[in-house]
C-alpha cells in the first residue's frame, strides 16, 4: 500500500533523449500536477521519428517483465493509475495486459488509461498486427481510452465523417467495455476547429479545438496524461477534465507555434523547432485558464 494519498502512476510508453513524446511528454506534467510517476520506456530513441536520422533501441518483452518483476519483489508495485502509449510489437501489448491484471491484484481500483497509439491522418506508424491486440485485448481492460480519430476508426471499423459517426464510434467503444471514451481530436469538416469529445455514464461533451497550421509530435501523449490527471483532480468530472486538458494543450501548442514561427517566418518549420514547450509552460500546466467550454450533446 502507498504510504500516503499521493496518486501513483506507472507509465509505459516511448522515450526520447531530445524532445517531447511518450514519457517525456507525460511524466513532467503529471509530476507538476502532484502525481508520483514511475516510467518504463518501450523504446529509447535519440529523437522522435519525424527527424531525418533515427537512432536507438526497443525494449524487448523479457526486459519489460524483468523491470516489473523488480517492482513486485521490492514491494513498490502499488499504483492508482496505469498509463500506456506507444509500443511497437503485439507481444509487448500482450505483456502489458498481463501487467494490468497483476497490478489490479494489488489495487483492484487501479484506473487504466489507454492511449492506443497506432497512427494519425489516415496512416499507421506501427505494425498492422498491433490493431487486433488493442481491439481485442487492451481496449476491454481500459477505464479511460484516448484515441485520435484515425485510431478510433481502426478499433471500431466505423468511419467518422460527422458528429453522428463520432457518436456511433463512441458507443461502440463503450460497448467494448470502456467506461470513459475521449476522442482527443476529430476533424469533422469544420475548417477552423477540430472537435474533442468525451463520454461517460450516458453523458457526452464536445469542445472546439482551434486548428494550428503546423505539425506537432507528442500532443496525444500529453493529452492522455493531462486527462488522467484532471479526471482524478476533478473527481471524475469529465466536462471539467476535458476543458482543463484542452486549455493546457492549446496554450502549449500555440506558444510552441508562435515561438517557432518567429524564427521561421515562412515555409514548413523543422521538427526541432516544434518540440512542445512544456518547461516554459509549467505555470499553464499547474493552473490552466479555461477559454473554450465543453457543451453537452446528449
Curated annotation (Swiss-Prot):
Binding-site list for Mg(2+): 120
Disruption phenotype: RNAi-mediated knockdown of this protein causes significant decrease in transcription levels of pyridoxal 5'-phosphate (PLP)-dependent enzymes phosphoserine aminotransferase (PSAT) and aspartate aminotransferase (glutamic-oxaloacetic transaminase) in silk gland, fat body and midgut of the fifth instar larva.
GO BP annotations, alphabetical order: pyridoxal 5'-phosphate salvage
UniProt keyword annotation of Chloroplast present: no
InterPro entries noted in UniProt: PM/HMP-P_kinase-1 (IPR013749), PyrdxlKinase (IPR004625), Ribokinase-like (IPR029056)
Record note on pH: Optimum pH is 5.5-6.0. Activity decreases slowly above pH 6.0, to approximately 35% of the maximum at pH 8.5. Inactive below pH 4.5.
Residues noted as binding pyridoxal 5'-phosphate in the record, renumbered to the chain: 47, 125, 220-221
Known tissue expression: Expressed in silk gland and fat body of the larva.
Binding annotation for ATP: 115, 148-151, 184-185, 212-214, 219
Effect of residue 88 to I: 62% decrease in specific activity and about 2-fold reduction in affinity for pyridoxal (PL) substrate and ATP compared to wild-type
Temperature dependence: Optimum temperature is 50 degrees Celsius. Stable below 40 degrees Celsius.
Sequence positions that bind Na(+): 115, 146
Pathway participation: Cofactor metabolism; pyridoxal 5'-phosphate salvage; pyridoxal 5'-phosphate from pyridoxal: step 1/1; Cofactor metabolism; pyridoxal 5'-phosphate salvage; pyridoxamine 5'-phosphate from pyridoxamine: step 1/1; Cofactor metabolism; pyridoxal 5'-phosphate salvage; pyridoxine 5'-phosphate from pyridoxine: step 1/1
Regulation: Activity is stimulated by Mg(2+). Activated by K(+) in the presence of triethanolamine (pH 7.3).
Gene Ontology MF term list: ATP binding; metal ion binding; pyridoxal kinase activity
Necessary cofactors: Mg(2+); Zn(2+)
Entry EC number(s): 2.7.1.35
Residues given in the record as pyridoxal binding sites: 14, 47
Swiss-Prot/TrEMBL induction comment: Expression is up-regulated by exogenous molting hormone (beta-ecdysterone) and down-regulated by exogenous juvenile hormone (JH) III in the silk gland and fat body of the fifth instar larva.
Family the UniProt entry places it in: Belongs to the pyridoxine kinase family.
Purpose of the protein: Catalyzes the phosphorylation of the dietary vitamin B6 vitamers pyridoxal (PL), pyridoxine (PN) and pyridoxamine (PM) to form pyridoxal 5'-phosphate (PLP), pyridoxine 5'-phosphate (PNP) and pyridoxamine 5'-phosphate (PMP), respectively. PLP is the active form of vitamin B6, and acts as a cofactor for over 140 different enzymatic reactions.
Subunit organization: Homodimer.
Name of the protein in its database record: Pyridoxal kinase
Organism: Bombyx mori
Upper lineage: Eukaryota, Metazoa, Ecdysozoa, Arthropoda, Hexapoda
Amino acid at each position: 500500500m502507498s504510504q500516503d494519498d499521493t496518486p501513483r502512476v506507472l507509465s509505459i510508453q516511448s522515450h526520447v533523449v531530445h524532445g517531447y513524446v511518450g514519457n517525456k511528454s507525460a511524466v513532467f506534467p503529471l509530476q507538476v500536477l502532484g502525481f508520483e510517476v514511475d516510467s518504463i520506456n518501450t523504446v529509447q530513441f535519440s529523437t522522435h521519428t519525424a527527424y531525418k536520422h533515427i537512432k536507438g533501441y526497443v525494449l524487448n518483452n523479457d526486459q519489460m517483465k524483468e523491470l516489473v518483476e523488480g517492482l513486485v519483489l521490492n514491494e513498490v508495485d502499488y499504483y492508482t493509475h496505469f498509463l500506456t502509449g506507444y509500443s511497437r510489437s503485439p507481444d509487448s501489448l500482450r505483456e502489458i495486459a498481463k501487467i494490468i491484471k497483476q497490478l489490479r491484484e494489488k489495487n483492484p481500483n487501479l484506473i487504466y488509461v489507454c492511449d492506443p497509439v497506432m497512427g494519425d491522418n489516415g496512416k499507421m506508424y506501427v505494425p498492422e498486427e498491433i490493431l487486433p491486440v488493442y481491439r481485442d485485448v487492451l481496449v476491454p481492460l481500459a477505464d479511460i481510452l484516448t484515441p485520435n480519430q484515425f485510431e478510433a476508426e481502426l478499433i471500431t471499423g466505423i468511419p467518422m465523417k460527422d458528429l453522428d459517426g463520432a457518436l456511433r464510434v463512441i458507443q461502440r467503444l463503450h460497448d467494448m467495455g470502456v467506461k470513459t471514451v475521449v476522442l482527443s481530436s476529430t476533424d469533422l469538416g469544420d475548417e477552423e476547429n477540430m472537435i474533442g469529445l468525451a463520454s461517460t455514464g450516458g453523458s457526452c461533451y464536445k469542445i472546439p479545438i482551434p486548428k494550428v497550421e503546423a505539425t506537432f509530435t507528442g500532443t496525444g501523449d500529453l493529452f492522455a496524461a493531462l486527462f488522467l490527471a484532471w479526471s482524478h483532480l476533478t473527481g471524475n468530472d469529465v466536462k471539467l477534465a476535458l476543458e482543463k486538458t484542452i486549455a493546457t494543450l492549446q496554450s502549449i501548442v500555440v506558444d510552441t507555434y508562435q515561438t517557432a514561427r518567429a524564427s521561421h517566418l515562412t515555409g514548413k518549420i523543422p521538427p526541432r523547432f516544434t518540440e512542445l514547450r512544456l518547461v516554459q509552460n509549467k505555470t499553464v500546466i499547474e493552473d490552466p485558464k479555461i477559454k473554450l467550454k465543453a457543451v453537452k450533446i446528449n
